[in-house]
Amino acid sequence: MKKKAVILYSGGLDSTTCMAIAREEGFEPYAMSFDYGQRHSVELATAKANAKTMGASEHLVVSFDLRKVGGSALTADLDVPKEGIGAGIPVTYVPARNTIFLSFALGWAEVLGAFDIFIGVNALDYSGYPDCRPEYIAAFEATANLATRAGVEGTGRFVIHAPLIAMTKAEIIRKGLALGVDYGRTHSCYDPTPEGLACGLCDSCRLRLKGFAEAGVTDPVPYAVRSKK
């Protein structure tokens, strides 16, 4: 019988590839997505449409409103930067987002009897978010085994899998294509147009387009503008 794994699944390029990797490694995926008041809710609609296609046995969407907290261009009335990828932590960082997401995933994993959680964080072609680093993943894994009944009673050890963390975006794309991922059914933009098109200029779009260019593949997603940098 396959081992269950909870996959943090946004509907974007990285999390979709992560789901495909979990399947390749023999896990039964249980997808978890979040409706947290994000301005790029097109991505969530993509996740809802494609979770079953990607092989998820279940798809759980958790709703809460981080707009009440604010502090990010994704959850507050702040402009999403379009000038290019800068230094430092950008305004698109959502305070403690991955900690919140992983905590929900940990709770569901414990209920499911799953000890494996997959998250598509990346520390190479990324925007500089502090909760995408290897040391953060290691620290949360340690916390997971201290903060749960299963961890304390020793019935199992939780593992946080971050298979993309040391891969370039081009390597991620090549891996996904080798596993049959249809990237035309993913969405990564932070600030889509009213029609749902990727803007092509935010950090996420720039990193995605750069990855496809370096992989020698055309991105199948339509863009309002296709950034060259």
Swiss-Prot record:
Free-text cofactor note: Binds 1 zinc ion per subunit.
Residues annotated for ATP binding in this entry: 9-19
GO terms of molecular function: ATP binding; ligase activity, forming carbon-nitrogen bonds; zinc ion binding
Cofactor: Zn(2+)
Catalyzed reaction equations: 7-carboxy-7-deazaguanine + NH4(+) + ATP = 7-cyano-7-deazaguanine + ADP + phosphate + H2O + H(+)
Listed pathway(s): Purine metabolism; 7-cyano-7-deazaguanine biosynthesis
EC numbers for this chain: 6.3.4.20
CDD domains according to UniProt: QueC-like
Source organism, top-level taxon: Bacteria
Any one GO BP annotation for this protein: queuosine biosynthetic process
UniProtKB keywords: ATP-binding, Ligase, Metal-binding, Nucleotide-binding, Queuosine biosynthesis, Zinc
Binding residue positions for Zn(2+): 189, 199, 202, 205
Pfam hit, one: QueC
NCBIfam families (UniProt xref): 7-cyano-7-deazaguanine synthase QueC
Homology family: Belongs to the QueC family.
Function, in words: Catalyzes the ATP-dependent conversion of 7-carboxy-7-deazaguanine (CDG) to 7-cyano-7-deazaguanine (preQ(0)).
Protein name: 7-cyano-7-deazaguanine synthase
Gene transcribed to yield this protein: queC
